[in-house]
Amino acid sequence: MARVTVEDCIDKVHNRFDLILLAAQRARQISGGAELTLDRDRDKNPVVALREIADELITPVQLREALLNDLQQVHLDDDDVPDEVGSLSASAEALRLTAETPARNQTSSRRAAAAAAAAAAVDYD
């Protein structure tokens, strides 16, 4: 189990940041079930990815294409359901109704003013 460092791979990928992006992409591929090109030797996926890059078993061009392909994909969550055409008008109607109703603070202050006026109008004679 030889120790792999960034220095071992820097002659294959000249930019350290690119190297890390590509190694992370390969580690994600390995986690997703991609075949290993060398013996794991109890190493974790990022170390295996760096070893594959250092030994030139995986080319940076292949990883770069896979990385760009993954970045271009759009993944919709269950909550991100596209709106229907009619829902826009329903939203506008709900907004209009909300704008017509008085705010909660205004209603309670009006009630308090009415109660005070009623109390003042009581004749104690």
From Swiss-Prot:
EC number assigned by the record: 2.7.7.6
GO MF assignments: DNA binding; DNA-directed RNA polymerase activity
The keyword Transport belongs to this UniProt entry's keyword annotation: no
Top EC class, one word: transferase
UniProt keywords, alphabetically: DNA-directed RNA polymerase, Nucleotidyltransferase, Transcription, Transferase
Top-level taxon of origin: Bacteria
Keyword match Disulfide bond: no
Pfam families linked: RNA_pol_Rpb6 (PF01192)
Catalytic activity, reaction form: RNA(n) + a ribonucleoside 5'-triphosphate = RNA(n+1) + diphosphate
One of the GO BP terms on file: DNA-templated transcription
InterPro entries in UniProt: DNA-dir_RNA_pol_omega, Pol_omega/Rpo6/RPB6, RPB6/omega-like_sf
SUPFAM superfamilies: RPB6/omega subunit-like (SSF63562)
Gene3D superfamilies tied to this protein: 3.90.940.10
GO cellular component: a single term: DNA-directed RNA polymerase complex
SMART domains linked to this entry: RNA_pol_Rpb6
HAMAP family: RNApol_bact_RpoZ
Family: Belongs to the RNA polymerase subunit omega family.
Quaternary structure and interacting proteins, as annotated: The RNAP catalytic core consists of 2 alpha, 1 beta, 1 beta' and 1 omega subunit. When a sigma factor is associated with the core the holoenzyme is formed, which can initiate transcription.
Function: Promotes RNA polymerase assembly. Latches the N- and C-terminal regions of the beta' subunit thereby facilitating its interaction with the beta and alpha subunits.
Name used for this protein in its record: DNA-directed RNA polymerase subunit omega
